[in-house]
Amino acid sequence: MFNHNEAILYEWVKENEPELFARIQRKVKEGKWHIMGGWYLQPDCNMPNGESIIRNISEGQRFFEKEFGVRPTTAINFDSFGHSVGLVQILNQAGYDTYVVCRPAKEQFPFREQDYLWKGLAGSEVLVHRSDENYNSVYGHVGKELEQFLEDTKDEPVSFCLLYTSDAADDLI
């Protein structure tokens, strides 16, 4: 199953490759492509104020509802350098129940668990998965990386399962 998250990237595909966009729409309907994230553009959450983040989410969700008939419930922000405690409440009010991040990296801020419940303001909470791996893979190495992922996680309970691949996927869409 494929997924991607930023509305602006889908817009560019729609404008520049309409046939590919139509194929993606079909794959979403078939359940072979999952819309996650839902932001218009993946933000850095250190500087923007809450209103900016809310508008970013609203624009992205509007696009995905119009073009695909879906509203994502998992927010993705792989490469943000900050996650304000106020973000939890914004995510909850936008309909998200899960949040996927890569930062802070385990070397910068070690947690015992990759998956945890983040409690924010006004009783809001969201299940977070912090990936300890990169969010891409080297072309041609997906099989090797998948084997390593399965070996590394064979004894761990699974609450989130994320696998990042970047090999060409023309045959799938």
Go through the PLM ranges and name each one.
Residues 1-166:
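Catalytic-domain carbohydrate-binding cleft regions of carbohydrate-active enzymes
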